[in-house]
């Protein structure tokens, strides 16, 4: 053994080829400070051996290296620029040391080689992947750029255009795609991986492969004619900005770094990368996006822990077909859990099966599935007009019409047909789980399971704990949601649960602006373009449906009359009473039609303005700051109330619920990250300016105390 540490082992194989194996404790390899230090020491040990002729990098795990240890980032990025620069330079010195070894090097890549893992393989002369490999630089998704030489080496290996696509999108690349552009030199079967890498090194030692020319090219300026370079980078900037927009600076910074470094050798090019990396690491956007990644890990960790308590869900059932039932059935069946779809009407079953078939056909058309896989998924969905096939289900999801009496009747019925230990969940968006539980003989096996529409696209599922729900029930539904490919958060029962409870105060703020003559299209523009929501409030209400919004608003007003009660008609009432239901009937705040390509088209509708003018008088202009304040303050305060009341367990889970359930702008990180970035004291001062507007604008005592102590909701 040449070198050994808890994360890396180096041994000498036949023909004087050394093998460096990444094999950290735990399930995956990642670049934390300990592993970087071990790699540095391992390379020093290798350099001291006079007989080594080549080096192969391997992994003792199912994956190569998943990337840097992101849990270290927020603490590290909070350091002074000088400390951060020192860390980046020391890390890069290790990768340079690997690249400068006086003999050929190769990486044998299996599973993920992402971020720092990808930058490791780029520092070697040859790269051989097996068929399980996924290679990529996802750093821009975290608001930063690669910091271990990725922006320097990748363009010199696969060309600037290909490298910019990899870096700015942050997507994982399949081995065959990596081979096409030259990121890897061969793709082999998993069992042949190490032997293929060693053979390539033997060929390099025997001078059949020119490893020195390859290395020289990686360390030199890019070979791009000046005019071609100018055109390439100008085009890239336009394309990248069109996708990333002004709120996500990292992709544009990556283009700029690659462009500036194009004419430089390795040392100067790396300095350009270092400076851009540090600048981005200090941004609020990076903090927010890294925070989302860490929050996602926390939520997934909780779901994994729940799996230990959970009942194994081998089969499921959904009661109520149609679009929602069909979406749930599709999601369950496509992720491998067979499901019975039960309804009282054949046309509804046909609609549900049609919805599943439509989603699957779209996947086949895009090349993401095959007709054989489509048939298998559809065979996993069993339509039924009676309860007989439901009796074998481990979990039953009730998804009938959103009416308490109808739901209570269906829940009482199904309980008679299912097994004693079957779990029953209601896909309700507003009706109290404790209220529905009263219709059941065994309320301990009942909880809420709130999917968001469209089911196949929306990642969040709210699992609602009623006062009688057992831990096994909650754990089993969390595990089932995870198995369906969803991100579950557990919330306690209250009107609107978590997501709708915090959404409707936002709509109330919007209604307040319209009641004073605000222009809904102007408000949407501010909330989309400046705050960063995917849809402004008027457009979102049209998509949700004004009938749904009207009903949910009444539920919230009844549940929280002091804050959400109404004294008269608002804009939602005006639209609903005039049968303007939104996209579903082609007219809401906006008018909807289909363009020449068959795609939905949204237009401002003069009729909406006439109706609002008749109800609320002449239009009045509001500036962007006031629009943002009056819509967001109620949502933020209600989110804080949910945390204080224990409706949601942590700031992390609340923020993930907002990002995944409502599309809260990821670059802002969620309500609690937004509050910490703004400063709780600054927010309290802003809210106090609008406190005269009512209870929704009045901060809690605990918020005021936190502000007085200069506190924050996150520790980092």
From Swiss-Prot:
Catalyses: a (3S)-3-hydroxyacyl-CoA + NAD(+) = a 3-oxoacyl-CoA + NADH + H(+); a (3S)-3-hydroxyacyl-CoA = a (2E)-enoyl-CoA + H2O; a 4-saturated-(3S)-3-hydroxyacyl-CoA = a (3E)-enoyl-CoA + H2O; (3S)-3-hydroxybutanoyl-CoA = (3R)-3-hydroxybutanoyl-CoA
- Please give the SUPFAM superfamilies that the UniProt record associates with this protein: 6-phosphogluconate dehydrogenase C-terminal domain-like, ClpP/crotonase, NAD(P)-binding Rossmann-fold domains
EC assignment: the record states 4.2.1.17, 5.1.2.3, 5.3.3.8, 1.1.1.35
Pathway it belongs to?
Lipid metabolism; fatty acid beta-oxidation
Q: Where is this region: 3-hydroxyacyl-CoA dehydrogenase?
A: 311-716
Positions of region (Enoyl-CoA hydratase/isomerase): 1-189
Q: Which GO terms describe its molecular function?
A: 3-hydroxybutyryl-CoA epimerase activity; delta(3)-delta(2)-enoyl-CoA isomerase activity; enoyl-CoA hydratase activity; long-chain-3-hydroxyacyl-CoA dehydrogenase activity; NAD+ binding
What residues bind substrate, as annotated? Answer: 296, 500, 660
Q: PROSITE patterns, per this entry?
A: 3HCDH
Q: What does this protein do?
A: Involved in the aerobic and anaerobic degradation of long-chain fatty acids via beta-oxidation cycle. Catalyzes the formation of 3-oxoacyl-CoA from enoyl-CoA via L-3-hydroxyacyl-CoA. It can also use D-3-hydroxyacyl-CoA and cis-3-enoyl-CoA as substrate.
Can you tell me which family this protein belongs to?
Answer: In the N-terminal section; belongs to the enoyl-CoA hydratase/isomerase family. In the C-terminal section; belongs to the 3-hydroxyacyl-CoA dehydrogenase family.
Oligomer and partners: Heterotetramer of two alpha chains (FadB) and two beta chains (FadA).
Protein name in the entry: Fatty acid oxidation complex subunit alpha
Protein species of origin: Shewanella sp. (strain MR-7)
